[in-house]
Structures are given as C-alpha cells and as structure tokens.
Amino acid sequence: MTHLTLPILEDWEGLTLTAILQEKFHLGKKARHEIRMSQDVLLNNKPLDDWNTPLFVGASLSLPIILHDKIPVYEYDLEIIYEDDFLLVVNKPVGMKTHANDSYETNTCANAVQYYLEKTGQEANALAVHRLDQTTSGLVLFAKNKLAIAGLSWQMENRAIHRTYLAAVDGTWGLVMQTINKPIGEDRHHGSRRQISPYGQPAVTHVKVLENDNENNTSLVECQIETGRTHQIRVHLSGIGHPIIGDTLYGGSSRANRIMLHAEKLHLNHPFKGKEMNFSAPAGDDWVF
C-alpha cells in the first residue's frame, strides 16, 4: 500500500489539509513537510496543490505513506495477534527487549517484527508505540508508518491506550480492589532499581485481586496503569508487601524462573478507522501460579 485514502468526515468540514494533518492525524512538522515535498496528495483523485483549500464532506483524500528508515531484521517468528495496513499487535516472549537501546542490538522484538514485514513482502517499518520490560511478556503495539505512529503515539501520551497486566505475587490479599498512587524515582544506591520516592514522578496503578492461594501464600492480580514509569507495577506491588513472584530485584520469591508479569490486554482506538479495538493474549507455558 502506497497511499491512505479516506473520505472527509463531518468534523473535518471546512478544515484545510494542514489542519487535518496536525489536528486529526497529530503529525509533526517534519512529517507534514515530507508529505508536502512528495507532491503526491490527491483530492478526488486529482493533485491537491493548495493546502489552504477548505475540504468538505463527501470528498476523497489520498495521502502518501511515509516510512522511517528500516532496521535490521531478526529471524524470529513472533506470535501475531492482529494486523492491518497500519498497525500490528504481537505477543512478546519473556527475555526479549522491545526495541534496541544501542545500534549493535538486533535481536529485539522490533527487529523480529521487521523480519516478519519483509518476509511477507510489506513496505513498512517496525515502530514500537510503547515498550515492555525485557523480563515481561505480552502484548506490544507496533505502527507500520509515520502516519500511524503519529496518531498512536498521541493516544499513548493522552492515556487513550489502556494496558492490563496479569501478575502472580507473594502473599494473599484481604482487599478485592486497590489503587496505588505513589511517585516513583531512581534508587541512588542501585542503578537498575526504582523506588517509591516523594521526589519521584507521579505513578498510579489499579490492582484487582483475581484469586488468592492461601495454601501457597500467593495471589493472582490484574493491574492497570495510568502512567508508564519504569518498573512501575513491580515497584508498586513490592512497596505494599506483595512483590511479584520471580522478581528478586524487588524482593519477590524465587519460586519461578521468570518474573510473573504478563501484558494480557490492550485497548485502543484505531487511528484511521475510528473504532475501538481490544486485544488479549494468555500467558505462556512458563507461567507459574
């Protein structure tokens, strides 16, 4: 696919192309400039040269798909949960980074997505909309081009994308629901750790208890985050005395050979189709509870 073609919607009535790209698609200045320089925007199948022309309901707008530079491929077959022309949802395995932090890292989830895109003959990029810790398994959302990443990133920044995690923790709970509203900051004494700190960034986690196992003194909980701080769920659960099983960095028991945290559900609005979308992926065979 080389173009995105869609009708002018009612709430776009009278807007110029610049306004639509900026206010509806949330495209930055650089991406808008790339589209302008392509000279490949069509209105009703004819070139649109004047970007100050008001657009009206019933017209058809066609925009060129602008891509980022491709990243190296990693020959790993991911579980694809959903895919269309603009986005892709995968079930990331535990132990795999979401994307590279350095140029030499090519065995990440993003590199595996790029491998899938090229293997299936797609002119697209693997652009992670959010990230999961290397030690966390579950759903990760990828955009395929600059048009898609702009709208999805805007949703992330405005908390319109909701993620739900499954965690197996030490100890049993008396409460069914609990909200943890405690700021998280760096641990000055341990570079890879975070801690609850009055000087940290705001962080809110909602916890729902699904099951108590009194015999083994463990619980299964569901967590929804309003913010996306590093190690947020791990720090918050540890901070109230229920560290995640396998998370020895934050005081969890070593009864599992992985951290028992899985991104189970994902909710978003499609950036172009305008519909709500819900995805889920069960935890893998290495899940212990």
Please annotate each region the language model reported.
Residues 48, 68, 94-95, 103, ...:
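Residue-level signature for short turns and capping positions that connect secondary-structure elements
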Residues 95-115, 149-154, 166-220, 235, ...:
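Glycine- and acidic-residue-rich catalytic/RNA-contacting loop of pseudouridine synthases
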Residues 73-74, 150-152, 190-194, 245, ...:
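A short, acidic/glycine-rich surface segment
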Residues 24, 116, 159, 187-190, ...:
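Conserved, well-folded catalytic cores of nucleic-acid-processing
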